[in-house]
């Protein structure tokens, strides 16, 4: 659901009334909206997750809550330490849960428990003021309500309902830390004994905001810095120095055009599935004062890859920089670890009953290395409630109906995978 659709009550009500099981209208807007949440274990669990701040690198409290909750549901739960507690850092850990002694399940369902800053408190809102509304249209707002605590909550209850119906279902749950800024949690899991070679699981279901659609593909990622070195001087005598900022600007201007240039003319790569690769100049800084010729400047740049590998895009960037600078090495791209970045990711969409889309954002999927697929290909699905368009915004929100439908969606994916 698009963010703007959250408040289009007329359309939502019309769609809801077409459902087999119609719901009564809630007409008394003065009633305690918390009662709707209190009466649902799913919604109560989601509320508890959102009420606990878990900005990346500070996930411990919400992790403990999830661990305790899963333990209370008679699952075997492991705390996989990612970063030990120290005087300067709090403990960071993934949560890995499974049934009984089945430590290597057939189906792995995963999402992340960290959020982007800042923390925004949990709140409930009727879709409009002064009109009746259907329960499923109740809006739940706050940081993480969508990304990705909606997926975490829906995954947990989909798994519990599946196990209630089929106690022998071979399901594992992984909730990791650090997805929003480093991928450290999934990388740690990927390199651990829980991800053997060859893999014991045959399906992985990733939980992210997909508007309840299956994702066929998402773009890859590459981050780098563009650095310019100059020579400081008094601004009254600029010819005695070399302005790093002035050197940086024309190169940035050219890089900014690469997403629109065709590849045969030096532009970024494209694909029929994902369209154009895009480039964002996210941060620029340099110099020390207005009356000093700047000796250093740099820009932080992010590329979303629609095709090819990170190394392909590095080559395109290097050639583009050299074209503007004529080989002057005082302006150069700094890629850091040349093993960093990820190519576009492709997912399975062979389960009926879902719309299929592509998305431009990245996920934990490339961080989970499936080490050997020679004997059996591991299927990967990407699905979840909520819209990415509000996921990192100050209006992050989801409806009750989306959360509840996500449980049904995850159950269908799990059932198709068992």
From Swiss-Prot:
InterPro entries documented for this protein: ArgE/DapE_CS (IPR001261), Bact_exopeptidase_dim_dom (IPR036264), Peptidase_M20 (IPR002933), Peptidase_M20_dimer (IPR011650), Peptidase_M20A (IPR050072)
Q: Which cofactors must be present for this protein to function?
A: Zn(2+)
Q: List the Gene3D superfamilies.
A: 3.30.70.360, Zn peptidases
Q: Please give the GO cellular component terms listed in this UniProt entry.
A: extracellular region
Q: Which residues form a coiled coil?
A: none
In this chain, Zn(2+) 2 is annotated as bound at: 147
Q: What is this protein called?
A: Probable carboxypeptidase AO090166000075
Note accompanying the cofactor annotation:
Binds 2 Zn(2+) ions per subunit.
**Which compartments is it annotated to reside in?**
Secreted
One Pfam family of this protein, by short name?
Peptidase_M20
* EC primary class: hydrolase
Q: Does the keyword S-adenosyl-L-methionine apply?
A: no
Write the Enzyme Commission number(s) for this entry. Answer: 3.4.17.-
One Gene Ontology MF term: metal ion binding
List, from the UniProt record, the residues annotated as the active site of this protein: 179 (proton acceptor)
Superkingdom of the organism of origin: Eukaryota
Query: A biological process (GO) annotation for this entry?
Result: proteolysis
Q: Which UniProt keywords apply?
A: Glycoprotein, Hydrolase, Metal-binding, Protease, Secreted, Signal, Zinc
The similarity comment for this entry is: Belongs to the peptidase M20A family.
Q: Where is the signal peptide?
A: 1-18
The entry annotates sugar attachment on 74, 168
User: What are the binding positions for Zn(2+) 1 in this chain?
Assistant: 147, 180
């Amino acid at each position: 659901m698009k963010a703007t659709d959250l408040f289009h009550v007329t359309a939502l009500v019309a769609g809801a009334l077409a459902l087999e099981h119609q719901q009564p209208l809630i007409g008394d807007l003065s009633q305690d909206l918390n009662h709707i949440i209190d009466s649902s274990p799913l919604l109560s669990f989601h509320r508890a997750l959102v009420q606990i701040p878990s900005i990346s690198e500070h996930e411990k409290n919400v992790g403990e809550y999830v661990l305790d909750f899963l333990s209370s549901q008679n699952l075997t739960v492991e705390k996989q330490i990612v970063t030990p507690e120290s005087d300067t850092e709090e403990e960071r850990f993934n949560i890995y849960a499974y049934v009984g002694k089945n430590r290597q399940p057939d189906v792995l369902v995963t999402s992340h428990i960290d959020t982007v800053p800042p923390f925004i408190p949990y709140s409930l809102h009727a879709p409009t003021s002064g009109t009746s509304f259907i329960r499923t249209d109740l809006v739940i707002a706050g940081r993480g309500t969508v990304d990705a605590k909606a997926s975490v909550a829906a995954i947990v209850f989909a798994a519990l309902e599946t196990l209630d119906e089929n106690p022998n279902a071979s399901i594992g749950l992984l909730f990791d830390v650090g997805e929003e800024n480093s991928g450290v949690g999934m990388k740690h899991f990927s390199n651990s004994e829980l991800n053997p070679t060859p893999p014991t699981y045959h399906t992985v279901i990733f939980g992210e905001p997909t508007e309840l659609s299956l994702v066929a593909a998402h773009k890859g990622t590459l981050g780098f810095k563009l650095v310019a070195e100059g020579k400081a001087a008094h601004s009254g005598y600029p010819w005695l120095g070399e302005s790093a900022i002035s050197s940086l600007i024309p190169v940035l201007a050219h890089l900014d055009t690469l997403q629109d240039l065709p590849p045969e003319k030096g532009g970024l790569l494209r694909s029929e599935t994902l369209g154009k690769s895009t480039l964002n100049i996210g941060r620029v800084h340099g110099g020390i004062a207005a009356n000093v010729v700047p000796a250093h400047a740099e820009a932080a740049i992010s590329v979303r890859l629609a095709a090819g590998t990170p190394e392909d895009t590095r080559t395109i960037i290097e050639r583009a920089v050299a074209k503007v600078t004529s080989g002057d090495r005082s302006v150069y791209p700094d890629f850091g670890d040349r093993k960093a970045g990820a190519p576009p990711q492709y997912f399975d969409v062979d389960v009926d009953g879902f719309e299929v889309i592509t998305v431009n954002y990245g996920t934990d999927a490339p961080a989970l290395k499936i080490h050997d697929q020679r004997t059996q290909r591991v299927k990967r699905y990407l699905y979840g409630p909520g819209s990415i368009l509000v996921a990192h915004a100050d209006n992050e929100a989801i409806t009750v109906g989306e959360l509840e439908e996500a449980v049904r969606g995850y159950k269908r994916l799990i059932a198709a995978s068992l």
